[in-house]
Structure formats: structure tokens, C-alpha cells
């Protein structure tokens, strides 16, 4: 796991076999998933058995009746109509399940969950569950420890990370979560809707808590303050993992040193090449994501069925990786190349299922149809990399996606830093695309001044229409003088 933090954003990458398989990006406008709000019911819709709740965001949140904790406070209580549960103007505590996406507001629930390192507290559940990924013997051990500790009426899920954890560690995690819940309740009692009463951890700590464990060989962090936060968190929650945390101190950027840029570049492309010469095409719509598999230049060595099987098997691996990398959720339809032999169809689905088993996000895969179609679902929580890195294209009525202004500015400013840090000269003149030049020199953006202060080098930029939108073209490098950059 790699954590890179700079003035613009935090990026967390998961690398398997030297390939980027997961990438998470957090900018000042953070995800609100996991946040708990004291909200106010704005409208109740009996026909949809749902309600709109004002939680202080741009759009009202959407609450389904099935996401409302039953008055009895236990699972399996008789279902009731939403109009008997909620009234306009009523205040209630809700937690965000899905970020706002497009024209839709956030999706929320009243079933609050507070995650810790080993446990997830469910204050309204009364249910104790243990991760099914753990062996039966370990599940029995953990159950015997946890059940006597959990207060009556409170629910707990024991996470996979609890494997091998000592009783004192589990008890400490539970006590921390119970204290946290009491603070959330107190803030909700004293608050006035709409108001946030609990904010989820930042991206770096959240992924360290939820994902980093014994399966990772190392965790490398390139920012001193983030490194110290991560080490402090692990010392309290998983001391044995602290020795796996490393500080990146090289001049070369962390992501550069691991060669991740080519994989990042493909994460927003519609077409992704396969090593055999084939490719997959990914199209995202409001309703679903379609993935089309093509042989491209690959013609095989035997017959059409063999060519289709080999391409489909390679595509199954890449599709699973791209779904994780792009964090694509919802309904996904994969159009594999037609194959006549049912055994070949089963082999491709088995390969896809095996690759998806690495995914922490829940997926369900159907059998392949005779037409080569595989329908699957992947839990949809955020807008994925598309939502962070791109925006609707202004030239085609919003039907396409292009890199957002913020993304282009960050890429160019990061490239400028690499020029200054990696170069031996003390002054540089670089050309930028006119639109990018305007972004870098926008009022209030002091990146150039910060780069000069950080590196002790001077950089001047000019607008050059021959330069690409995210290109940094080095025009002159030399030594700094009172007049600017002198040719060296």
C-alpha cells in the first residue's frame, strides 16, 4: 500500500504483483460516506415508501423505508408504512451509505454503524456477527470473547482483521467505539438539524484501518505528518504492523518510483489494451456499465474458439482489475467473445470470479449466456475515479467525460515539481497549454510560489498553444539571475 499526500490531494494505491489494482483519491471536497448527520425530514413519499431528508448538503438525502430501524429496534420487526414512521419536520439521525451522484442526493440509513480496527459497532442491532472469511475455529474463539463483552441491545460485527487478536485488543476496540457512540449521541441531543455529528476518518487512516493487514508486505508514506498519524494509529490498534510502515524520502516521487503512472493513465481511458493484442472497451451510463471484449489484432494460433477463449480469459483478469481500479459499482454487463463450448464459458466465468475474490467490495456474478454476456453487480458507494478525475465534456452536451480543470491543474503542477526536483539547473522556463496556464495562474493559486520556496529554484511559465492540455514543455533551463532564467 502506498500513501501519497501533497497540497492538492491524498492518493492511496494498492499494488499487487507490481500492478496498480486500487487507487483512491481524496481532495478537499471529501466523500461523505460514513458521516452521521442530524437531519430533518423534508418530504415523505408514500408511493415510493421513501423520504427526503435535509442533512445540510446541496441536495436532500434519500431514505428508503427498509433503511429505517424498526421501532422495536430489532431485525425482523413487522414492516410498517413510511408515513407511520416519519413526518415532515421530524429530526432524526442518519448515516450516509452512498455519496451524491449526478442528479441524485446521498442515500442514507438510520442503522448507524461505527467501524473500528477489529469491530463494527451497530448501536441499534442487538446482533453479534463474525466475518465469514475467518475459519470456523477462529470464529468460535472470537465469538466466545466478544459475546460476554457486548452490552445488551447493542450489535457488533467482528471484522476479518480481528483474526488472532487478543481479548484485551478486542475489548479496547469495543470500549473505544462505545465511547464514540456516546459522544455522537450527546452531539445529536445538543444539535440543531441539519448538522454533522460524526465525521468519518480521512482517506489515509480509513484505508489503513479497513484494509491494511498481514496480507500487505509494506506501507510506504511520502508525507511526514501522514506517516506519523499512521504510525500513531497502528501503535494503538495493531502494533505488530508498525514495522511494515516506511517513509519515502527519495527525490523521485513515490508513485513514479513504483512505475504507477501508466496504470493511472489507463484508469480513465475508454479502451484498455490487452497484452495479447486485444482490448476491452468500458462505457459507463446512468443505468449500468458495459464492458466489450474484442480480439483486436490477436488472431490466435489454432482456431476461432481457442482465440476467443484465450482473449476472454485475459479479459476476465483485466476487467476485474479495472473494476477495482476505477471503483465501478452498480450493474455491470460484460460482453465476452462468443464461444460454443459450455466448458469454455464456465472457465471464463470461473476466472472472473477468482479474480474478483481479491476485491474487498461485494460482487455477484451470474452465469454466461449463450451470447457471451455476463451480468454482475458490484456494491456502489462512491462515484469512483470517474467522479473524482473527470467532468462532463462541455463540447458534446455532457455525453462524454474529460479530465476536470482541477485534475489537469494538479497533473501539470505535479509535473512542474518533478522538473524542478529532478533537474540540475536553478531556473526554468516552461510552456503550458493556454487553458492550463490560466488554471495555474488563477487568482489565489500560489503553487508556483510554493514550488520556488520548496526547491529554491525559479520557474516561469508561458502560454503556448502548441502544448497539450496536460503537457509541461521545457523551453529553457539555466541559472537564476535578477532578470529571470538565463540560458545555460
Q: Which role does the model predict for each range below?
A:
Residues 64-65, 232-261, 266-271, 275-313:
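Metal-dependent catalytic core segments for phosphate chemistry
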Residues 127-264, 268, 382-488:
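Charged, low-complexity intrinsically disordered tails
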Residues 2-108:
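Charged, low-complexity terminal tails
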Residues 1, 22-32, 77-84, 99-108, ...:
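Active-site phosphate-binding and catalytic loops of NTP-dependent enzymes
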Residues 14-36, 87, 136-140, 257-269, ...:
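A short, contiguous, amphipathic alpha-helix enriched in charged residues
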